[in-house]
Curated annotation (Swiss-Prot):
GO cellular component, one term: cytosolic large ribosomal subunit
HAMAP family registered for this protein in UniProt: Ribosomal_bL27
Keyword check for Protein transport: no
The protein's name: Large ribosomal subunit protein bL27
Lyase keyword on record: no
Coiled-coil zones: none
Cross-referenced Gene3D superfamilies: 2.40.50.100
Molecular function terms, GO-annotated: structural constituent of ribosome
GO annotation, biological process: translation
Family that this chain belongs to: Belongs to the bacterial ribosomal protein bL27 family.
Keywords in alphabetical order: Ribonucleoprotein, Ribosomal protein
Amino acid sequence: MAQKKGGGSTRNGRDSESKRLGVKVYGGQEILAGSIIVRQRGTRFHPGVNVGVGKDHTLFALADGKVKFGTKGALNKATVWVEAAN
């Protein structure tokens, strides 16, 4: 007779790596052109002046300056823009 029970198997034990999404530079902070402002899935934040959009919806600065967050349009969409440094 067996001295130990047979080892069971499980279908658990996997998880995906976190994608480190979110705001990387907050309102009022200085930023350099090309720096990432927000990493996101979909356009939770929309691009404003001096802000570009990557193919994965990442928002990045097109000019050096100060990051600003706010809303725009009739639908009050969350928007990010960069006030260019003079």
